[in-house]
């Protein structure tokens, strides 16, 4: 089983298509289809299952996924609305959720690939390399992604 969070989004659905092209049909898409038209990105793709992100998180924390043979997690899911002003929601959805997924993967030695964001560099006046001097998030979305990047660096300092 391969998990793709944010699998109904633009990047996630293209990732699912690429996995399908490589013969992977055991893809579970985790997303939040609040926008009714978002499902269109998944049409024509081989998806073994769809899980709502909240249901999935509840199942993950409850142990329902402990016996599932997950081979990889591609974490593309996030609230990417740069105008979102609810900081608690953004931290819960983008930072805490990401930490939960990361620890699930680490505890089971599952490869975990996640998407950060160029927004952690602000306007980019300081450059776009992973150097704390260059990172200057300008909104709560960018800050939530930045915090997870920092968390990963502290937890896995040699990971690339």
Task: Explain the meaning of each model-derived region.
Residues 2-24:
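N-terminal Rossmann NAD(P)H-binding glycine-rich loop of SDR-like oxidoreductase domains
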Residues 28-56:
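Glycine-rich phosphate-binding loop and adjoining beta1-alpha1-beta2 segment
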Residues 92, 96-100, 107, 111, ...:
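Catalytic helix-loop patch of NAD(P)-dependent Rossmann-fold dehydrogenases
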Residues 5, 30, 73-77, 112-118:
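SDR active-site strand-loop-helix element
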Residues 15, 68-73, 85-113:
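NAD(P)-cofactor binding segment of oxidoreductase domains
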Residues 44, 53-54, 58-93:
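NAD(P)H-binding glycine-rich loop region in Rossmannoid oxidoreductase-like domains
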């Amino acid at each position: 089983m391969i998990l793709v969070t944010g699998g109904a989004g633009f990047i996630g659905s293209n990732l699912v298509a690429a996995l399908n092209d490589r013969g992977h049909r055991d893809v579970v898409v985790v997303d939040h289809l609040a926008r009714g038209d978002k499902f269109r990105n998944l049409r024509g793709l081989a998806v073994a299952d769809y899980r709502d992100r909240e249901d999935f998180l509840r199942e993950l924390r409850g142990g329902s996924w402990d016996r599932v043979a997950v081979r990889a997690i591609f974490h593309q899911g996030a609230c990417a609305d740069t105008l979102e002003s609810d900081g608690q929601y953004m931290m819960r959805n983008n930072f805490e959720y990401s930490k939960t997924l990361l620890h699930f993967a680490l505890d089971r030695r599952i490869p975990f690939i996640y998407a950060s964001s160029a927004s952690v560099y602000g306007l980019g006046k300081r450059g776009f390399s992973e150097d704390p001097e260059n990172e200057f998030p300008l909104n709560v979305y960018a800050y939530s992604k930045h915090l997870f990047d920092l968390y990963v660096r502290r937890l896995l300092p040699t990971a690339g």
